[in-house]
Amino acid sequence: KKIPFQEIDKTDHQISFYASTKKSTESLAHSYSSLWKLPITMLRFFTVYGPYGRPDMAYFKFTKNILKGKKIDIFNRGKMYRDYTYIDDITDGIYKLLNKAPSLNSKKKFKNDSLSSVAPFRILNIGNTKKIYLLDFINTLEKELGKKIKKNYMPMQKGDVHSTLSDSSLLKRITGYNPKTNYKIGIKKFIKWYLNYYH
């Protein structure tokens, strides 16, 4: 499997409903863009974490269970990595894109540009561009919470992927995007928010 992921990589054979819905959304958006000449930029987010995040995300559930003294399920024995991207870096990237809408007359200026040839449409990765192993992420949670984690090692989940890593160089070339938050700092900020918000 090719890592890091680029916007122009083929994504035609999804192995989960989650991935299928994301691909379907991109296809529908491209159709709208083509039919009505509507400028659209689709963003592929890479494992966003931080305050006010989705409670169903692993880092959120881990934190909740650790504080309750419950075991946390660690799939594939933790032998996987993700491109954890802090919310502040995500919002910074989105803000930089606001005046960079694709146009029908645009020409591909960059190598591996995902700009459509028939619509004002482009797909962009937005990630931290660094691989963080799951166990390193969990160990940092443990340190910041000051609690020993009870771990329940599980096999790989059906439909899950071993690793994700973004190539966000196209976004950087278009906007100057440059994620700055180290995952340890991001976790520290998240834990501070979580304890204040929920306790």
Where are these regions (language model features)?
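Short clusters of hydrophobic/aromatic residues that line enzyme substrate/ligand-binding pockets
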Residues: 3-5, 49, 74, 151
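Catalytic helix-loop patch of NAD(P)-dependent Rossmann-fold dehydrogenases
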Residues: 1-42, 53-54
